Regions:
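Bacterial N-terminal signal peptides
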Residues: 2-11
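Mobile gating loops/cap/lid regions near enzyme active sites that modulate substrate access
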Residues: 45, 394-558
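Non-catalytic accessory segments of hydrolases
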Residues: 13-174, 443-454, 469-473, 506, ...
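Gly/Ala-rich beta-loop-alpha elbow adjacent to hydrolase catalytic centers
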Residues: 206-210
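Substrate-access "cap/lid" subdomains that shape
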Residues: 88-90, 98, 183, 190, ...
């Protein structure tokens, strides 16, 4: 772990874990006491919030299961954000290895027994950090204790190679990031009452990769009883085959083996890495983290480049989401309607022209961008929401609520957004965090009265769900439970008023594929090129991939 900052100041007033449990009010003193020692907080007077930042919840050796943190003697200074876990971001390696810390934010009130929201950041399980949503304003909006978690990423958070399987069955799963998340939830169970949270009312939520992690925990025996409700923001059901993943990892690491003179060719190196012996494990564990962090950095939401969430048979069942056994809790699924737009804007085919603005001056380029954005977005929307619910149908007993955010798609209301990104991947965050970390994208599009009312209601739904597992109350448009009638909540706004209503989304991937086939805005050749190079292999594109895989098999047979 990274260095832990301590304060030598003696604690005059503390609130022990035991005393908080029996107290009727929360002790707002500067220092609290958790299982591992005293901890000093920060006060955000502007947002009326209390923060404990960079708090270590676990320690771990490389590719081993996390363990509880050692107790400390002095007072831990939790007034500064902790280091993020090592990652390759913006073409450079940042962060430190095994930075297993979390942030806690709560309203600056004396209330206790507050709902707890544990949040997992996005970033393809390769990048990102706990400050994706800081919680300073959100904790008060939801009247909850907000916990945001840093966990291991990339090839250090997931690694399926046999040579590393020297521990328990859970440790041998290769799903180290999931083990970190489980450990964070254990920490919450043991310590959250100290911060006025209710350990028996915990909601696990995540965005993007974090949302996919949440979905994976629903079928994981490791997470049984660790939380009470779940929210997946833009996160569908994605898992990886363990043997296929080993091949991909060995191929990715092979150049380092050759560079270090252990094998003469990359093919030899790959075959060597697929063996199971201590020499390989020792080599991998002694590699610099700076050399491992950039691996598979070009994944672009493709599991075929960076496979993770392995169906190992212990942490994740071999049958994946076909299992009959779930951690059956109330579930909320939230998606935008143009989920693929951000990824298209950064795709090598479009990125330069998108950033310069040339794309929007070229009719052909604009048509190619629109085709990829629109159909990719529709497939992605289904994957995040109704398609996930359909896979659970008949096996999952708890209530499922699905919302689809349309705000950003109407050129009469949000002209800049509608012409570029629309209701993009993560647009919900603009409703939850002030100031928004998407300010460069949204400009002033959320400053009108309609967007403000929409955002207020969205937070009210979340607040209700955290409290009871039901997002509804008498002051809100009824959010229907999803069923085989495909009921969802449509969320949008005009400039002057919110536009929130119950709706039906019965569309299927087959319907979208038929639209793509019938689309005449581009030639068949260009469409095929976009389908196979831009849209294929993504988290959401399995229905499209099946078509081209079948065509390739037919060509081989002929």
């Amino acid at each position: 772990m990274g260095l832990i900052a301590f304060s030598a100041v003696l604690t005059l007033t503390t609130c022990s874990h035991k005393s908080t449990e029996s107290a009727d009010t929360f002790n707002q003193s500067t220092t609290q006491t958790i299982e591992t020692g005293n901890i000093k907080r920060k006060k955000d007077t502007e947002n009326n919030a209390l923060e404990w930042l960079g708090v270590p919840y676990a320690q771990a050796e490389r590719w081993q299961a996390p363990k509880e943190v050692d107790k400390w003697d002095d007072t831990f200074d939790a007034t500064e954000y902790g280091e993020k876990d090592i990652q390759f971001s913006n073409n450079e390696v940042v962060g430190s290895e095994n930075e297993l810390n979390l942030d806690i934010v709560r309203p600056d009130t004396d209330e206790t027994d507050l709902p707890v929201l544990v949040f997992l950041h996005g970033g393809n399980n390769q990048t990102g950090h706990a400050q994706e949503i800081k919680g300073n304003t959100l904790a008060n909006d939801l009247n909850a204790v907000y916990v945001s978690v840093n966990y291991r990423l990339g090839a250090l958070g997931f690694n399926p190679l046999d040579a590393l399987k020297t521990g328990s069955d859970e440790e041998n799963s290769g799903n180290f990031a999931l083990l970190d998340i489980a450990q964070a939830l254990d920490w919450v169970e043991k310590n959250i009452e100290t911060f006025g949270g209710n350990k028996d009312n915990v909601t696990l939520a995540g965005f993007s990769a974090g949302g996919r992690d949440v979905m994976a925990t629903l079928i994981s025996p490791t997470f049984k009883g660790k939380y009470d409700k779940a929210i997946s923001f833009s996160g569908g059901m994605t898992l990886s085959d363990e043997e296929e993943s080993q091949e991909i990892f060995a191929t990715a690491i092979a150049p380092l083996v050759v560079e270090d003179g252990l094998q003469p060719t990359e093919e030899d190196a790959k075959n060597w890495l697929l063996e199971d012996n201590n020499e390989i494990a020792d080599y991998l564990k002694n590699l610099s983290a700076d050399r491992l962090a950039p691996f598979m950095g070009n994944a672009g939401i493709r599991l075929s480049v960076f496979p993770h969430l392995y169906k190992d048979g212990t942490v994740i069942p071999e049958e994946g989401f076909e299992t009959e056994t779930f951690n059956d809790v109330p579930l909320m699924l939230v998606t935008g309607t143009n989920e693929f737009s951000l990824f298209i804007a950064s795709d090598e085919r479009f990125a330069e022209d998108f950033n310069s603005g040339d794309l929007f001056q070229d009719e052909q380029k604009q048509a190619e961008f629109d085709y990829s954005r629109n159909y990719g977005g529709q497939l992605y929307r289904l994957s995040n929401g109704v398609d996930s619910a359909r896979k659970l149908a008949g096996k999952y007993n708890s209530d499922i609520y699905i919302s689809e955010i349309f705000y950003g798609d109407d050129s009469n209301v949000t002209p800049q957004l509608a012409s570029t990104l629309g209701a993009f991947h993560g647009i919900f965050k603009a409703m939850l965090q002030t100031p928004s970390n998407y300010a460069a994208f949204i400009g002033e599009e959320f400053d009108n009265d309609g967007a403000k009312d929409m955002s207020s209601d969205f937070k009210a739904y979340l607040k209700n769900f955290l409290a009871s597992g039901n997002p509804n109350d008498k002051n809100l448009v009824n959010w229907p439970k999803w069923s085989e009638q495909s009921k969802v909540l449509s969320i949008s706004a005009t400039e002057n008023a919110k536009d929130i209503k119950a709706a039906t989304d019965s569309e299927t991937a087959s319907d979208i594929l038929e639209k793509m086939q019938a689309d005449t805005t581009l030639s068949e050749g260009v469409k095929n090129e976009l389908n196979t190079t831009v849209l294929s292999g993504r988290w959401f594109s399995a229905p499209l991939d099946e078509i081209y895989s079948s065509q390739e098999e037919q060509v081989v047979k002929n």
